[in-house]
Amino acid sequence: MKYLDEYRDTAAAAKLAEAIARTVTRPWVIMEVCGGQTHTIVKYGIDEILPPSVELVHGPGCPVCVTAMEMIDRAHAIASRPGVIFCSFGDMLRVPGSRGDLLQVKSNGGDVRIVYSPLDAVNLAAANPDRQVIFFAIGFETTAPPNAMAVWLAHKRGLKNFSVLVSHVLVPPSMTAILQGAGNRVQAFLGPGHVCAVMGYTEYEPIARRYRVPIVITGFEPVDMLEGILWTVRQLEAGETRVENQYSRAVRREGNPASIKLIEDVFEICDRKWRGVGIIPKSGFKLRYEYRDHDAERRFEVDDIETQESTVCISGQVLKGLKKPHDCAAFGKTCTPQSPLGATMVSSEGACAAYYAYGRHLQSKSEIRNSKSETNSNGESGKLKTIRLGREDVPVCQAGACVCENVAADVGQH
């Protein structure tokens, strides 16, 4: 399939892996921001076929994972009330708060429904005028346009029984918070392709300049990730710090102007608390004053609910790139997708869920480290012998011709 097969091409990926190994001369720490990127890295073993000196750490780009526990408790409180229909995407139903999760509310008789679009919730409100319908509006900038459209449409149609519980968060302030945080080791970022498809990447340019970090916007296929890593390493080795767009087939510098205008019409920027991270200034969206009647926190008076987060789960440190899932003593033991202790194990985009899904809980930390330190037949460290795409191990030396002309031109002859 066009725009898919060539970005999963084994030969192209192998050539990129070898180009990275040839380019790197010193240790570098690169953070992939988005949870979708994390899953690609773990699923295809990309982190295991990189040179030992290139370390990938996982960032806060999982919207379910960073939704504050108190927001889950507010959702729990609203959904437990009689006469309401509480709507959410499915992955939010199992996220634990201090009072339990939304599935427990449903099992106790609450009307909690999974929807596939916020417009489904608007239609429910129109069909049930005698009931309050609430949509749990979480996510990064990617999901803000449809949520804004739902609010705008409900307001236009005069649906006074429709409201949204807003917990939108923004990527650029989180990157700044990571760079300013204690113990930060991140030297470059793989930027979030889906977010940038909506917002563009002008907001990332001041971050690259101020903190002197390369930022490469990437897609989500193996070749996307490896090409993004190669571009990042080239910048690091050359002492360059700029924003590059590897995901040019989907991302423009200016983003999607129509979506941005819709967001700006309905939302305004606010401070936001992130689970495991704390309050990050100007890192969220809230409804503008003219749409206040659709604010579920205001309508149900739950904005005073505050919650202390558990100290057992280390998901906050995972989200900041300070630890990895296998650093947690509970990972794969008392914390599994069936009985998660934290949001990073619940969400399909969470780093802990990715590690578990692709068998990392079956490996010891030493096995994971050793998988990156193998040498080739000539004894050269960093010259990787194989690349794994899916369940297939392909010798790098058999890379052959690249079917993706752009990649071939980028890495040169094998």
What does each model-found stretch correspond to?
Residues 226-317:
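Internal helical hairpin/lid segments
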Residues 165, 183-252:
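A conserved active-site cap/scaffold subdomain adjacent to cofactor or substrate pockets
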Residues 27-30, 161-162, 238-248, 274-275, ...:
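Flexible, glycine/charged-enriched surface loops at secondary-structure junctions
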Residues 1-130, 144, 148, 154-157, ...:
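Metallocofactor- and cofactor-centric catalytic cores in central/energy metabolism, strongly enriched
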Residues 363-393, 404, 409-414:
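Short, basic, low-complexity termini and linkers enriched in Ser/Thr/Gly/Pro
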Residues 136, 140-203:
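Phosphate/pyrophosphate-binding betaalpha-module
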Residues 71-74, 126-133, 177-182, 204-206, ...:
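Short, surface-exposed amphipathic charged segments that create phosphate/polyanion-binding patches used
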Residues 6, 65, 136, 140, ...:
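Hydrophobic alpha-helical scaffolding
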